[in-house]
Amino acid sequence: MYNHKVVEKKWQKYWLENKTFKTGTDPEKPKYYVLDMFPYPSGKGLHVGHPEGYTATDIMARMKRAQGYNVLHPMGWDAFGLPAEQYALQTGNDPATFTDENIAHFKKQLQALGFSYDWDREIKTTDPNYYKWTQWIFEQMYKMGLAYEAEVPVNWSPDLGTVVANEEVIDGKTERGGYPVYRRKMRQWMLKITAYADRLLDDLDDLDWPEPIKEMQRNWIGRSVGAQVTFKIKDSDKSFAVFTTRPDTLFGCSYTVLAPENELVKEITSPEQKEAVDAYIKSIESKSDLERTDLNKDKTGVFTGAYAINPVNGEEVPVWISDYVLATYGTGAVMAVPAHDERDYAFATKFDLPIKEVVEGGDISKEAFAGDGVHVNSDFLNGLHNEEAKAKMVDWLTEKGVGEKKVNYKMRDWNFSRQRYWGEPIPVIHWEDGETTLVPEDELPLRLPKESNIKPSGTPESPLANLTDWVNVVDENGRKGKRETNTMPQWAGSSWYFLRYIDPHNDKALADPELLKKWMPVDLYIGGAEHATLHLLYARFWHKVLYDLGVVPTKEPFQKLYNQGLILKNHEKMSKSRGNVVNPDDVVDEYGADSLRTYEMFMGPLNASIDWDDNGPSGVKKFLDRVWRTFVNDLDLDPIPSEKITDKNDGKLDKIYNETVKTVTEHFEELRFNTAISQMMVFMNACQKVDKIPREYAEGFVKLMAPVAPHMMEEIWHVFGHDESVQFAAWPTYDASKLVESTVEMAVTVNGKKRGNFQIAKDASREEAQAAATALTHVKEFLEGKEIKKVIVVPNKIVNIVAK
């Protein structure tokens, strides 16, 4: 009887002690770098959703090793971040201790699932020897002018005591914890990701990534070509610029809208409108950018009392403020052409503002017309279609000095400051004379001081501001300074971790350039689609910066990306609050890690979201037990190969075996693990129907199944008499000539009635087929005393006999 508890522990211990999965370094072999998105080690541990992606990468790693590749398959921990700090605040425990305990638990769970990680390369982002290089990268960005300080409107969460990124705000509340968010201006460190916008966009074309992810990044970057136009304020020396993708519609501009935060608002608001404007600004303080720009929300706004001059025709147009205009996007001001823009139309209709048609083709009494058409009411643009009119208007604006062609991006620079304790310290000193300097490179890492009181300060400063011994510094000339007290966001450490795995213990460089050249880019990266516009975009940005510095040899970090789907319970995402979390430890205990791994790969396509079936693992366990009984005789204490295993080959399994090798190999390569496992089940069914199984085929099957169910296959491999791990056995190949049957089954009819079947060599002659048919006992009985008048042979199909 196969005992998964004993066998799995035995092989996990063996693999760990023998470093079976140490990264290969043979210079003659090709490389394969297969990577999981490293997890945040939360207090909850793994749930059954985690192993799905991890099993997929593990299958690829194990197959590629067997195919003769040097494989890099590492694991580490994205260990900074808010949850550990929140826990520390609530319990008074040190976040470092809490994090390390969680890591130990996660690691134990991963090892119990038999993943073939090279644990010698384990990293964690909270290790000073790791974040030394996170800080080093920040310093290079600072020197390149890509890291800068700015007073910017931010999403401030008083409850968390920190700023959160736009991407981390959902419906005016923080993604983690659901706390309210308010907009306020604060001094922040910013990273100039916008400087790389075009490259981040253009280089997507060369990546083997899911198209929806590429599209999400394209939309997030949001490149648009248009014009910047200057509007002067009436009776004032003030002016403002607007960005528009439709400069051709400038003659139809009937009002303008400024972002409520725009500095100009205070200066131009009339005394009569001041109260209404101030009240409106206060009312939108806690709204996130996403909420404010939602196309479906009801339009709100207030007239400032000021007018602007339309540069193209000298008309006076009212200046309004509205929350759908963001200070951080474009210029923080828009020109409104309600006849030809849906949002402007809704706003104009609500506030009874003029709607002027300048492009023919729609019915503006009913809705805005945004399509192509002939320009009207547009002076020198009349009669032109959209594209010609745009070009002509840009030329006119440029010539008159009131505008120019402009490219704009929806993406903003990355807010890189967090007012928290548990993050990488930013290696900067602010001196009393106003100078800002970097901590010298030879003094890195700038370590996070150990501290028990990590309550948020409630100000734009992090809890580090309370640690005066750490904060206050004096240089050799007696000049006083203060360390930067903001820390980096959790995204920092994950923006380059895939590089550190290549050379994790190097204290002289981020990684050896020769090793980077050998291993980059990552060949296969598997993780959740939720990281499309955060981690994946940030990692590409950092990688391009390092490429420009000559640190990395490739423009892109991840050549192929694949998103696994969610594992649901009762058609809902698993979460503690819903009480529907399935713990993998329980499944492993009852059915074994091999059953869990095989079930998760067999459930359905890897990229689909699928409902967990509590009976699934037991069904898979029955299949694995059948594999064991087919190949192993364990009636005595020492298991031996089954009596069915033979060194002879009668050819009965030739076709199905070679078909299985071909299908499994191809489907693994295509990450179609469910259909590959189906094919292995088909082969096992065929094995049940024969008396003998050629040893070569039994061993070939074990090699094919080993990446999915490694513990049982390792055990069977050793029962078959091998000393080395099945991991080092060459991957099976198939014989194409055996993919076709060498024999066929033919039917026999006598006088139109079927009287039997027989096996015969494929493409046998008519004479051979007739002889075989008439030799059948059953047929002989029907032919007795009759004369055969006619025999019709349909090759490989049927023998028709007419007898009287």
Curated annotation (Swiss-Prot):
Residues that bind ATP: 576
EC number: 6.1.1.4
A single cellular component GO annotation: cytosol
Gene Ontology biological-process entries: leucyl-tRNA aminoacylation
Record InterPro entries: aa-tRNA-synth_I_CS (IPR001412), aa-tRNA-synth_Ia (IPR002300), Leu-tRNA-ligase (IPR002302), Leu_tRNA-synth_edit (IPR025709), M/V/L/I-tRNA-synth_anticd-bd (IPR013155), Methionyl/Leucyl_tRNA_Synth (IPR015413), Rossmann-like_a/b/a_fold (IPR014729), tRNAsynth_Ia_anticodon-bd (IPR009080)
GO MF annotation list: aminoacyl-tRNA deacylase activity; ATP binding; leucine-tRNA ligase activity
Protein's UniProt keywords contain ATP-binding: yes
Pfam families tied to this protein: Anticodon_1 (PF08264), tRNA-synt_1 (PF00133), tRNA-synt_1_2 (PF13603), tRNA-synt_1g (PF09334)
Sequence motif: 'HIGH' region, positions: 39-50
Motif 'KMSKS' region, residue numbers: 573-577
Keywords: Aminoacyl-tRNA synthetase, ATP-binding, Cytoplasm, Ligase, Nucleotide-binding, Protein biosynthesis
Catalyzed reactions: tRNA(Leu) + L-leucine + ATP = L-leucyl-tRNA(Leu) + AMP + diphosphate
First-level EC class: ligase
Subcellular location: Cytoplasm
Family as reported in the entry's similarity comment: Belongs to the class-I aminoacyl-tRNA synthetase family.
NCBIfam families: leuS_bact
Protein name: Leucine--tRNA ligase
Originating species: Lactobacillus delbrueckii subsp. bulgaricus (strain ATCC 11842 / DSM 20081 / BCRC 10696 / JCM 1002 / NBRC 13953 / NCIMB 11778 / NCTC 12712 / WDCM 00102 / Lb 14)
Name of the coding gene: leuS
